[in-house]
Amino acid sequence: SFAKVEYWDKLCEGIDKAEQELFSYNVEVERMCFNQYDKSSFDELIPRIEEANCQGVVIATQFHDSVVKLASRLDQLQIPYILIDAFIENTNCVAYYGTNSYDSGYIAGRLLYEQINPTENIAIFRFIRKGEMQVTQVMKREEGFRNYLAEKNYDGRIYSVQLHADEPEKNINILNAFLEEHKEVNAGIIFNSRAHLLGKYFRDKGERFRLIGYDVIDPNITCLNDGSITHLIAQRPEVQGFNCIRALFRHL
């Protein structure tokens, strides 16, 4: 499941375009959606995919262990699959479409480091998930981010701010409490496309906060233009979605 302004909406636009172009070849894409903040909803799809009688699968790699389980089952059934969003090792995927998560986090570390002093405290904002603490891609991005700072001998403190996927009022209270307690923090990062939610919060508060986010979606671009987001790291999800369907078609 996704909101219409998110990375996944853009990715589906690319999938739709590829399906339309391959219509004359009798290519049909069946979408099976899950809650990206609830691992159990992904797990519930696995038996449905096994029974779907499909010739190929595109897997969004939100939950590492569940993706490995599904990939293993598809290997047994001899059904080819493509991974999208984050690469998972020890799978036999036909192809992977997405950015190098570690490298993008490393770049994000450089972008933020250039805006702060080496002892300045910063924040990492996260949206809480059910069933698995972090998605594979986010973990790799954060690893790259932290490693860059470590290489630069960054000596500040990195705070973790846990937010809730569908509770905006609760999030405002969490952010208010955090900033009240840590008035010195005015720089941070979020490793997904929801940077605009934070950008809007800081804009409405009149706070000058140096924020880095991911994905060039319209609300994020608005925040980038008004200065409530300082940098965005782009993935071009519509191209990823298009290419994964085309690649699976060529393989078959």
Regions found by a protein language model. Give the residues of each.
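An alpha-beta-alpha
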Residues: 108-152, 248
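Hydrophobic alpha-helical segments within soluble ligand-binding/sensing domains
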Residues: 96-123, 171-172, 220, 236-252
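Hydrophobic alpha-helical
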Residues: 44, 56-75, 157-221
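Flexible loop/turn connectors
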Residues: 203-252
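Short, surface-exposed alpha-helical segments at coil->helix boundaries
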Residues: 8-16, 43, 102, 106, ...
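Amphipathic helical "hinge" segments at domain boundaries
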Residues: 1-44
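Flexible loop/hinge segments that line or gate small-molecule binding clefts
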Residues: 66-103, 217-229
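Short beta-strand segments enriched in small/hydrophobic residues
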Residues: 1-11, 94-95, 121-132
